Amino acid sequence: MANTFRIHMLKAKTGDSFIVECDNEAFFIDGGTRSVAKYLKRYLQENYLAKLQAVFVTHVDRDHIGGIAKLYGQFSEYVPKTAPIYMNHPDQVTITTNTSGLVTYEDGNSLKEVLMKNGYVLDEATTGKILDFNGVTVEVLSPPSVVAGQLFTEWRASDDGLVSTDLIEVDCSNVPPEPKNNISSDIVNASSIALTIRHAGKTALFLSDSLPEVVLNQIEGKIKFDIVKISHHGSKHNTSMELLRRIDCNNFIISTNGPRSYGHPHAETLARLILSSIEHGYSECNITFNYEKVCNRIKINNLPSGFHVNLIYSETITL
């Protein structure tokens, strides 16, 4: 099992949840919605050879933290206390562990209080932090501490649960206009933890729901990555050509079940991924989805001759 680098993409509905395996070391990145907790628990039960090294909670949106809150609130006996939890502002997440075993957000102690009371180690993750886990290197690209400090308690309304069946038509004839974001008006996503994981000569970039403007400030020149988890489920507002021109990569992950209310993934984002791969000199672009129905809804138009786009459905990627 030496030099293995594997990414498991859990079915987190509108959210994100990843298990990253580097040889016998395992890492959780986000926990999706509450329904994902049972999959995280099952992994800990069944993969006793894989040692959980750390848990990263990228930000406080429900579709990223729900499963983590439930995991620690209801199944904490399966989570080793040796694995630190990296999270900014855990005091803003409240959970209740009651006799019925249900976890809620509206009442109860903060997640920070629950974790500390049960002996877990909490730490912040801001720009510049570099962590080493038995040869696996994790580097935090964002958020800067000044942005993380601006985070206020603002939870997104829950999704309606309806999945779109509409065709996603991607036009590769022109570069879509760049997104225009206001960090102060989207501080929850602006404060998302973006990080890289390096192991066995491979590097993966996880962009969470980060804003391109924030990550751009931490990337100098062009950097090569073996795979990139695209920000905010493929939203057109969170991926820019300016950022992609600094990210030398043609292998991408998009985590979403394609909710009707958000329209993820957006055609503009897919076009940017394809066109940036062409600019970097690749002959193909690989985009992996964790829901097959989303993958099957995409139609690529006006693709340059000789260039190939591989739309892949998979729940596991091995680098």
Regions inferred by a protein language model and the residue ranges of each:
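C-terminal regulatory/interaction regions
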Residues: 2-5, 213, 220-222, 246, ...
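Conserved beta-strand hairpin/beta-sheet module of binuclear metal-dependent hydrolase folds
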Residues: 2-48, 187-211
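A short acidic (Asp/Glu
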Residues: 19, 65-69, 96-98, 216-219, ...
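Flexible, acidic/histidine-containing loops and adjacent segments that form or flank the divalent-metal
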Residues: 74-203, 283-291, 295, 299-319
